């Protein structure tokens, strides 16, 4: 019998909002390539993620992983905080 390999989608981004209760908004940057001209350009997408302990703050670099749908817009949860935000930048 084959064992199921659990590979969940993992993304890294910057926390842009932590105002909601147990929810953060993470901006994830990706580089895409134009099919005709082959020029690379940056694309930013925002994802709502579940932060159970409310430990992430604005400006933190975090890793989020896919999970079952938690609400209408939340399909990710916070896995770990890779780098804390600097005091003067991002936090108010």
Swiss-Prot record:
Keywords: Ribonucleoprotein, Ribosomal protein, RNA-binding, rRNA-binding. Transmembrane segments: none annotated. GO terms for cellular component: cytosolic small ribosomal subunit. Disulfide bonds: none annotated. The keyword RNA-binding applies. One of its GO terms (biological process) is translation. It comes from the Bacteria. One of its GO terms (molecular function) is rRNA binding. SUPFAM superfamilies: Nucleic acid-binding proteins (SSF50249). InterPro entries: NA-bd_OB-fold, Ribosomal_uS17, Ribosomal_uS17_bact/chlr. Part of the 30S ribosomal subunit. One of the primary rRNA binding proteins, it binds specifically to the 5'-end of 16S ribosomal RNA. Belongs to the universal ribosomal protein uS17 family. This is Small ribosomal subunit protein uS17. It comes from Mycoplasma mobile (strain ATCC 43663 / 163K / NCTC 11711) (Mesomycoplasma mobile).
